Amino acid sequence: MASSESRYSPTSLEPKWQQRWQEMGLDQTPEPSAERAENFYALSMFPYPSGNLHMGHVRNYVITDVIARLMRLKGKRVLHPMGWDAFGLPAENAAIERGVDPADWTDRNIAQMREQLQRLGLSIDWSREVATCHSDYYRWTQWLFLQFLNADLAYRKEATVNWDPIDQTVLANEQVDADGRSWRSGALAEKRKLRQWFLKITAVADELLDDLEQLKGWPERVRTMQANWIGRSSGATLRFAIEADGKQAIEVFTTRPDTVFGVSYVVLAPEHDLVDQLTSADQRQAVEAFRQSLQSISEQDRVADDRPKRGVATGGTVQHPFTGQAVPVWIADYVLPDYGTGAVMGVPAHDSRDFAFAKQYDLPITTVVVEPGQAPDSGEPSEAFTGLGELVGSADFDGLQGEEAKTAIIQAAEQRGVGAAKITFRLRDWLISRQRYWGCPIPVIHCDDCGVVPVPESDLPVELPRDVDLSGSGGSPLERATEWKQVRCPKCGKPATRETDTMDTFMCSSWYYLRYTDANNDSAAFTNASIDAWMPVDQYVGGVEHAILHLLYSRFFTKVLQQRNLVSCSEPFQKLLTQGMVQGVTYRNPKTRKYIAPSAVSDPNQPTDPDDGEALEVFFEKMSKSKYNGVDPGAVVDRYGADTARMFILFKAPPEKDLEWDDADVEGQFRFLQRIWRLCDGAKASGLQLQSPLPLPAELTPAETDLRRAVHTAIEAVSDDLQGDELQFNTAVSELMKLSNAMAGQLEAVSTAVAQEAVRSLLLLLAPFAPHLADELWEQLQGSGSIHQQRWPEVDASALVRDTITVVLQVKGKVRGNLEVPAAISKDELEQVALASDVAQKWLEGNAPKRVIVVPGKLVNLVP
């Protein structure tokens, strides 16, 4: 029996191994191989340094760590770095609310979270740590901005922003609540136009869409989300001339030029430049009132499908491009200024949204497309016909169908000079300006004589000034940093001013994976050699909430940098795993809608509100402080150890599914690790050592054959689970449990060589999952070096060969028993064995079956 000194005690052994690994430099990135296939880049999406890890973080980073550890065991040279997405609004808010410096607040949080991550036993190369708020990082973010500027992919233009009329400052979208009010002053936010910086992501829209086909290692839903966001549409632009002068025109884009003869109105975005010109005197007041009513409504709400569409007539008209007839012009909330041309043609008979709008405002509905061979109904239709069909009421184009009709009308529009074929995208250029302090400064200078002048690369970084007043009003806090703002123009030397906007934090996170490849380089953001060695990232892990923006912007950066010969890859991430959320049990009073903390629930089986006795609703939701359903990772590590936390996170659910936290299952994983401890403790007591592999006996006993089969079945299954197209950590842990059960009580019944192979294999398979325990047991059993310096076990195919197999016996499709038969049995022989079995005789009652269905090696089904 094991002594008390040999009890499994993770609280003592885990810190020991974390220190040992650090001293050994075990997690340091080795020099990459010249062969890219020999290198492996494992990466988690880096976190915002809030100061506290949550279980979602743990799941993300443990998944990546298992992959990194596996690849090291398989002989790969692994890059597994970590850093901090450290700019952003929370630090600025903390500075205002608590009177602390954002840099100090952020650095304290980073130190705290780094320690929390290290307690999880993650094999991270901390020598490559980056923080986007440190000038040695954002120097290169600024350098990259200048690359975009030099390539004419960065520009300034007027854009609509949220404006706080009390604080006299611009608000980010996240600073405006659901009612359209400022988060600070409570004032109703207004819309204003300001000159803003943009990156021209639309310049590579085709590549971003087409190259999604290359990303076979990405979840299909993520690729679909990106494709929909990019939203490529083929159609035509058509010009509706303004009757007043005949020179100006409203240009609309449509995917259905075949419906142009059904146009009964044109709709402009309320912000369109031509609205004032087209608005008649008697409609001006109504138009202005409508515009004002949109000030507090977000663009998302304006275009939401479930929201009634509102509009108002301008009183102006335009000329139909084919008939010359006057078409009334309206403005409506569902047309956005920055989408397409900011104008659409209304064809209510053939567009559901236009149909609803026309019905609401009593506008004409004219059918011009019908099912082939069908005459149009008399009177107005009861609903829009949105499919392709045969043209009617379309002058010379009557009788044309579908794509042929579209092509003919586009050609006619081009010949008349009133339109052209066009491809458009839903994707809009990326607005990167932020009127905030805690962000990367935009490295340009404004000169009255020279205009916008890039900061010379030799002057980078443009560092954020310290001791800036963050609580005042009147635009960006950097506007008030007078000494910092006032500079000399790099071109002419005259007085000039710095750009006071900072960059969207996505700018910093769109290239950090490149910096990790050469993180300590003081003279370049990265090098061709470092990119060629490590990029693209082999396995990227992060939440699906980043499916569009972060992942799309990262792809954009990579494509632009490839075009400028700065990187060799066209895509940043080869494989992507989007892990599910971690959910906690949640208690809520159905009457008051108040959430109740689990500690206040006296009986979890029949939970009631301690205040009013109301029976509580019980369900699982994403962990959050407001719902009292969070679990502190530190507390779990304190009680059970990091290895148990890791095992639970990996075992509880497939990685892409949501995981429901269960304390009982955590306890179950702790007991499983204790069983492995006892198993190896018993092997140690019997004198087993792992120092050098012993030769297997020439002849194996049945017990040895069975144990070796269990060992190599586990090696094959775990290897497949960790390297297949779909990573299945949960089933891999199940295989470890099966193997440990097969080994229990059998090590004493087999030769030392077979026992050694079994224990060695079990610990190597366990190592990526429970790295501390695996290394401790490896050391206790005299293994050489660290277990994480060994090689992943290979499957011995001969060990999997069975002399007999188990075949399922069914009668009328229902399982009635099993047959143990020779593995080499023929189909006819298997049928005869089945018919002669006691099970068959019992269920057939001595009668011959009408049919016998034999699936060799699998089953026999007798049909009476």
From Swiss-Prot:
GO biological process annotation, one example: leucyl-tRNA aminoacylation
Molecular function GO labels: aminoacyl-tRNA deacylase activity; ATP binding; leucine-tRNA ligase activity
Reaction(s) catalysed (UniProt annotation): tRNA(Leu) + L-leucine + ATP = L-leucyl-tRNA(Leu) + AMP + diphosphate
Membrane-spanning ranges: none
Keywords, comma-separated and alphabetical: Aminoacyl-tRNA synthetase, ATP-binding, Cytoplasm, Ligase, Nucleotide-binding, Protein biosynthesis
Main subcellular location: cytoplasm
Ranges for region Disordered: 298-317
Tagged with keyword Transcription regulation: no
Binding positions for ATP per the UniProt entry: K625
SUPFAM superfamilies: Anticodon-binding domain of a subclass of class I aminoacyl-tRNA synthetases, Nucleotidylyl transferase, ValRS/IleRS/LeuRS editing domain
Bias-annotated ranges (Basic and acidic residues): 299-309
Taxonomy, superkingdom: Bacteria
Disulfide bridges in this chain: none
CDD domains per UniProt: Anticodon_Ia_Leu_BEm (cd07958), LeuRS_core (cd00812)
One cellular-component annotation, GO: cytosol
EC number of this enzyme: 6.1.1.4
Motif ('HIGH' region): 47-57
Compartment list: Cytoplasm
PROSITE patterns (alphabetical): AA_TRNA_LIGASE_I
UniProt motif 'KMSKS' region: location: 622-626
Family, per entry: Belongs to the class-I aminoacyl-tRNA synthetase family.
Protein name according to UniProt: Leucine--tRNA ligase
Source organism of the structure: Synechococcus sp. (strain RCC307)
